[in-house]
Every structure is written in structure tokens, then in C-alpha cells.
């Protein structure tokens, strides 16, 4: 699942994609100013007293590893934190706990609820956040099933099973789950070409690679993409670098 690559901390327990450092993109959705109001809760005691930040990158080129702009900040107190403010348009930001990236948040009109605990991170209260975290839950389910098959194959190997035996036991199911996971990514991005979710999740996908690369999955996404999506600063820069 795609959220933020973490250091060895106890307050986020994620499948493999959640360990990836993510980039952040802000995208125009409407010409009207958007007002965000975020009420956050956390059951993780180690976060108490820490500063929480909403960060974004102004041009789509910077990454979490380099420079990001701090849009808003507050301190976690007794498991509660809050943000409120105005932005020119709906955009995707990243929630940080001091230097640690926690999760993406779509800044959209309305009262948003953010939950951070050791089991999951979620945002609710706005249509785009609801859609994003529904996708994350499905992605998480597939990742967990894939992880369990990998664990099963390791147990079989330690028990003396041959590679052929392991492949017969888990290979077909594993391949099916991997296809479903890839198809889920492609479907979500293509269905959201015209709003911040499409380029945002595309960026989360691309962040798993050490350098820009054109994969079959990325090709499937961009081959039918409209100009609006391809003109996004991150998407445009990534494709230019990957095609060199």
C-alpha cells in the first residue's frame, strides 16, 4: 500500500508499499478557494508532544527527501491535533510527524477526520479522501494476501520443499494477486486522471523505484492519459527522465 516509507518506528505498521518515501503534488481542481478543517486523533503515545506538519511541494519536482513547503503546523497534545486554513484549490498534501512522513491527505472543503494508530491510518469526511482511503484499504488487503503467500513459500522452503513444489502451491495464486494489485493501481489512476488523486497515486507508485523507469504498468497508465494528466509537473518530469 502506498503511504510513506518509514524509519524503524513503532507507530506505523504498514504493508510493503507503506515503507516507501513519497513525493507530493498539488493539483488544480477548481478555481475557487478551498477551506480545510482537519481534526486529528492518535492512540500512539510516542507522538504526543511532537510537531505535526502539512507539507507539499510547489512544483512537483521536489521529493520528500529534499525540500517541501510547510503549509501548516500544530503540536500533538493528548492524542489530538488540528489544522485549518485556505488553499487556492483542492490539493494533495503529506502529513508529517516532525521529520517522519505519516500519510497523504487531500485538502478539500469540509471537516476532515484523521486517525493515526498502530493498525492503520485513515482520512474521512471528504469525497476525495474517502475515495483515496477506500483504494488504500483494497490495496492493503491485496498486499497482505501477497505477504502471506510469501511467508508460506518461505515456510515450505525451510521444510525442504523444492522450488517446483513451492511454485505449484503458491505460484498461480501469487501471480493472480500481483495482477489484481497492478490492475487496481491502473484503474484507480485512470479513473482519476482529472483530479488530484490520479497524479497523486501515480507519484506514490513511482516512488518505489530508485530512479525513473518505464514499466508495463506505467505505460498502461500514460498511453491513454489526457493532456491535463500528462502536463502535471511531476508526471511530465518523471516521464521525461524515464524515457531518456
Feature-to-residue mapping (PLM):
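Bacterial Sec-dependent N-terminal signal peptides
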Residues: 1-42
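A non-transmembrane, solvent-exposed segment enriched in polar/low-complexity residues
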Residues: 32-175
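Positions in alpha-helical segments
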Residues: 130, 137, 183, 200-203
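Surface-exposed, polar/charged faces of alpha-helical domains
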Residues: 155-172, 176-179, 183-198, 216
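Charged, long alpha-helical assembly modules
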Residues: 190-244
